Amino acid sequence: MALSNASSLSTRSIYGGDLSHRPSNRQSSFTFHPAVNTKPKSVNLVTAVHAAEPARNAVSVKESVASSSSGALKWTPESWKLKKALQLPDYPNANELESVLKTIEAFPPIVFAGEARNLEERLADAAVGKAFLLQGGDCAESFKEFNATNIRDTFRVLLQMSIVLTFGGQVPVIKVGRMAGQFAKPRSDAFEEKDGVKLPSYKGDNINGDTFDEKSRIPDPNRMIRAYTQSAATLNLLRAFATGGYAAIQRVTQWNLDFVEQSEQADRYQELANRVDEALGFMSACGLGTDHPLMTTTDFYTSHECLLLPYEQSLTRLDSTSGLYYDCSAHMVWCGERTRQLDGAHVEFLRGIANPLGIKVSNKMDPFELVKLVEILNPNNKPGRITVIVRMGAENMRVKLPHLIRAVRRSGQIVTWVCDPMHGNTIKAPCGLKTRAFDSILAEVRAFLDVHEQEGSHAGGIHLEMTGQNVTECIGGSRTVTYDDLSSRYHTHCDPRLNASQSLELAFIVAERLRKRRTGSQRVS
């Protein structure tokens, strides 16, 4: 996989300057000082311009970011502390927090800079229709469900989906997991109440516990160390699966044929599955046998929301090859809907790291605000650096997305447009559990593809909360999950996920849509 082309990294290059002058409106939970209060070391400080290499068609928007507070501040891995930080936990023991962060700073990187650069190049292809992004995995990874079987099953379904999408679109599919680090979750409410008892909300296993008691809900910095070790172990297993023969195309194709045979809509998917199988036979006859590396290995990347900034900073390293800083907790990180403030701490941190970045966008996003945010994060307009992940429901998608596309196009910015059909379709079932309807998810994907056809832009991919397990969290699909079924296998720690069958069914439908668009046929109804 691409994970083998790693660039060398220097040791940690984060200086320990005095930040006692920072504004008082920053969350007090992160008021920690270096043990030795010295002048900043002489390092290659990264500005927003240095975060991404100059592109040929660099452009500016109406308001130059240089005049904004983000542009005026010299970036360092800890300059985010000078900004207002939302959604961060309030750790009760600052000394314990500092000790944990220093421990993580001494750990090896989880991913390497060269791998992140490879992903950025692939995403640049998706921006112009030469590739398609498949990004999927847990809403929130957990410590309790961490085992090789769960990792393998999710990886397997992503492989199956990628084969189907590759054949339908006739372009490479970029496989990126919401895995090996997707723990922290932003919450709408800081507290939750049950039976008259009010406690802090569960914010992810790397912050606090989901058990509803006072001890579990206290943020514990030591959970970050466990999250690091679980992420490293997960990625180690993913590397083995990707390069050790498990990802062989012939094996994955047989899995898809088995799925089709067991599907209630077998006739709908049989033709596509058989065509993939025939294509493999043709390739084998031409001499590209099943033992060729192209047929037995695959590239796989990891991603998560950049939410817990102290953890992300502690894994930020100066790459000795490029002279740029990379957040080595994942190949790609994204900024969530609740933390994308132009003058906020999360945007400040993200603008200085060289990883490919995602921006989650709902129907609340103003087109001009999106243009300004992209300019802050990608001032040199480097293709592949910015992926805009749209999440707003089918109806809003048809109304709001065209304005966002037009605003970005007018600015001359290059982004990769991706559809997240999950977050805009969460409802509460009669039994009280959160769920999502498969038909609503599919409707949003179709709306996303329709809008891009109408606007003459490129639909760059899909972003899904999904699992390889046979859970019953989203209703619908060909193997129908009903409201009555939800409680039987409802295992999510946060939001409902598509199960393996629903995920693969969605991939077949999207692949057929991509194939018909490619061949100039009528749209799928």
Swiss-Prot record:
Residues 1-35 are annotated as: Disordered. It comes from the Eukaryota. GO terms for biological process: amino acid biosynthetic process; aromatic amino acid family biosynthetic process; chorismate biosynthetic process; response to wounding. Gene3D superfamilies: Aldolase class I (3.20.20.70). It catalyses: D-erythrose 4-phosphate + phosphoenolpyruvate + H2O = 7-phospho-2-dehydro-3-deoxy-D-arabino-heptonate + phosphate. Induction: By pathogen infection and wounding. Residues 1-13 have a biased composition (Polar residues). Residues 1-52 form a transit peptide. It is an enzyme of class 2 (transferase). Pfam families: DAHP_synth_2. It is found in: Plastid, Chloroplast. Pathway: Metabolic intermediate biosynthesis; chorismate biosynthesis; chorismate from D-erythrose 4-phosphate and phosphoenolpyruvate: step 1/7. GO terms for cellular component: chloroplast; mitochondrion. Its EC number is 2.5.1.54. Keywords: Amino-acid biosynthesis, Aromatic amino acid biosynthesis, Chloroplast, Plastid, Transferase, Transit peptide. One of its GO terms (molecular function) is 3-deoxy-7-phosphoheptulonate synthase activity. Belongs to the class-II DAHP synthase family. This is Phospho-2-dehydro-3-deoxyheptonate aldolase 1, chloroplastic. It comes from Arabidopsis thaliana. The lineage of its organism: Eukaryota, Viridiplantae, Streptophyta, Embryophyta, Tracheophyta. The gene is DHS1.
